[in-house]
């Protein structure tokens, strides 16, 4: 029987303690080895919480699937901030460029239901709203409208999804 352990771990810094150790221990796998593999696969997400799925089959073979961090975490990493605004709408904590929004949208490609880059970019911009992050110096909602109106089409030219 295959067992699956899902956890949210710090990128590149998972450890054998909770939540991984107690969940993997009863499965009889080498926890240290699994944690090392997870850290290797998540090191690019240093400082962010990363969803991982550890799949252990009957023969104790381990497969590790790494998801992408939450959109808010990716935005904070791009901006170099620790947290969003506690007073969104009146307090701005950062400004993100449209190219950074596109970069995050590409990273989230596998995890979203959108069918194209533009729609995923709008989702990323939507996450900026409650965080107090502006896009290209204006409120994120206004940037979403500008995206719909084609203002950033030159950036997206030739982009395949």
Swiss-Prot record:
The gene name reads rpl11
One Gene Ontology cellular component:
large ribosomal subunit
Disulfide bridge positions per record: none
Residue ranges crossing the lipid bilayer per the database entry: none
Q: Which CDD domains match?
A: Ribosomal_L11
**Keyword annotations of the record:** Ribonucleoprotein, Ribosomal protein, RNA-binding, rRNA-binding
Pfam family for this entry, one: Ribosomal_L11
This protein's record includes keyword Ribosomal protein: yes
Q: What is this protein called?
A: Large ribosomal subunit protein uL11
SMART domains per UniProt? RL11 (SM00649)
So what does this one do? Answer: Forms part of the ribosomal stalk which helps the ribosome interact with GTP-bound translation factors.
Give the GO molecular function terms. Answer: large ribosomal subunit rRNA binding; structural constituent of ribosome
Q: What does the entry give for GO biological process? A: translation
In terms of superkingdom, the source organism counts as Archaea
On subunit structure and binding partners, the annotation says: Part of the ribosomal stalk of the 50S ribosomal subunit. Interacts with L10 and the large rRNA to form the base of the stalk. L10 forms an elongated spine to which L12 dimers bind in a sequential fashion forming a multimeric L10(L12)X complex.
Q: Which family does it belong to?
A: Belongs to the universal ribosomal protein uL11 family.
């Amino acid at each position: 029987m295959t067992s699956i352990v899902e956890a949210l771990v710090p990128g590149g810094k998972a450890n054998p303690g909770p939540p991984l150790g107690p969940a993997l221990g009863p499965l009889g796998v080498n926890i240290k080895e699994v944690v090392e593999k997870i850290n290797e696969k998540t090191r690019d997400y240093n400082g962010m919480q990363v969803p991982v799925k550890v799949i252990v089959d009957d023969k104790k073979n381990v497969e590790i699937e790494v998801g992408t961090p939450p959109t808010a975490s990716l935005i904070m990493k791009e901006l170099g901030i620790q947290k969003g605004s506690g007073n969104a709408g009146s307090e701005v904590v950062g400004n993100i460029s449209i190219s950074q929004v596109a970069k995050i949208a590409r990273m989230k490609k596998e995890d979203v239901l959108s069918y194209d880059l533009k729609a995923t970019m709008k989702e990323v911009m939507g996450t900026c709203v409650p965080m107090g992050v502006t896009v290209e110096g204006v409120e994120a909602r206004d940037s979403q409208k500008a995206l719909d109106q084609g203002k950033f089409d030159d950036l997206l030219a030739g982009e395949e999804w």
